[in-house]
């Protein structure tokens, strides 16, 4: 068993310079890719509702003025499309818009690296190369590269979800190492609460942007429970996770969901519309 002060220099203190280096390399690759492609590709979804939703995000909701201007997609959470509309309104070129919209993909790089660090928290050149290889492998998915030149909100919704996974896994590694190397590390164990709350908030943000992230949200919760160092800490983790999620949902999602419920009959329209319409007293 190591001394109580030795483990502080372990998994608790990731070499962020290494994460920064990996992020810069991934950023260069992503930006070079969108420049080589020649900018954004404009598909049917872009013309049907992406620009319209971005307009609502920037100029204000229009659910009480327009009658399903983009069909059922008119009720989709619009704020992830705000940058797209703003760039278009200010005359950005296709390449400039693609570079800006690729930023969430770049922001996922340090989160993926943190996941690799949590699983392999060793220092040294060889360990760093192993983590970089793991992170690079994660970004080799053709789907990820295909989304870089699109206006889809998939990457924007995936960014907070990936960070939620990273924070939960990292704090789980911290707590497990604290229990193993320093039985008196109660302060460290108690310090995971804010991180679990932050992870819950990020999950709520991802769900607000794209409800199909629900399955990934369950995965984050499973990781949070599975990495708890003691049975007694599971309840605290779940409570902090839920509190962070509810707070973020009330702040970020509920104002728009309330408008959607009142105008379209469901806060997650078109799902549950028939069941929830009677609660607002009219059939839109």
What is each stretch, according to the model?
Residues 75, 100-104, 123, 129-137, ...:
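Multi-pass, polyprenyl lipid-linked donor-dependent membrane glycosyltransferases
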Residues 2-8, 182-186, 216-249:
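Perimembrane helix-loop-helix junctions
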Residues 17-44, 140-142, 243-261:
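Transmembrane signal-anchor helices characteristic of membrane glycosylation enzymes that use polyprenol
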Residues 51-57, 69-95, 99:
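Short hydrophobic/aromatic helix or loop-helix immediately within or flanking a transmembrane segment
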Residues 86, 96-124, 163:
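Transmembrane-helix motifs of polytopic, lipid-linked glycan transferases
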Residues 188, 195-211, 217-222, 251, ...:
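Membrane-interface alpha helices of multi-pass inner-membrane proteins
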Residues 111-114, 136-146, 156-179, 184, ...:
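Specific aromatic-rich, kink-prone transmembrane helix
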Residues 239-284:
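Membrane-lumen/periplasm interface segments of specific transmembrane helices
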């Amino acid at each position: 068993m190591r001394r109580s002060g030795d483990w502080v220099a372990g998994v608790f203190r990731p070499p962020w310079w290494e994460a920064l280096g990996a992020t810069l390399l991934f950023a260069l690759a992503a930006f070079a890719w969108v420049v080589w492609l020649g900018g954004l590709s404009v598909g049917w979804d872009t013309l049907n509702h992406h620009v319209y939703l971005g307009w609502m995000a920037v100029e204000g909701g229009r659910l009480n003025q327009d009658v399903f201007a983009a069909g059922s997609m008119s009720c989709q959470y619009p704020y992830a499309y705000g940058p797209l509309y703003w760039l278009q309104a200010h005359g950005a070129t296709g390449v400039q818009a693609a570079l800006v919209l690729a930023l969430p993909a770049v922001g996922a790089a340090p989160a993926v690296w943190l996941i690799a660090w949590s699983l392999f928290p060793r220092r040294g050149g060889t360990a760093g190369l192993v983590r970089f290889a793991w992170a690079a492998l994660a970004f080799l998915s053709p789907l990820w590269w295909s989304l870089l030149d699109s206006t889809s909100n998939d990457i924007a919704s995936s960014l907070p979800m990936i960070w939620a996974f990273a924070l939960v896994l990292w704090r789980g590694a911290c707590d497990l190492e604290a229990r193993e190397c320093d039985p008196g590390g109660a302060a460290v164990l108690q310090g995971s609460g804010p991180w679990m709350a932050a992870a819950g908030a990020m999950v709520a943000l991802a769900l607000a942007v794209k409800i199909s992230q629900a399955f990934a949200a369950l995965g984050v919760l499973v990781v949070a429970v599975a990495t708890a160092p003691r049975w007694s800490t599971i309840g605290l983790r779940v409570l902090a996770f839920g509190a962070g999620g509810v707070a973020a949902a009330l702040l970020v999602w509920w104002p728009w969901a309330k408008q959607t419920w009142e105008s379209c009959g469901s806060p997650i329209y078109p799902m549950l519309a028939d069941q929830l319409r009677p609660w607002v007293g009219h059939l839109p």
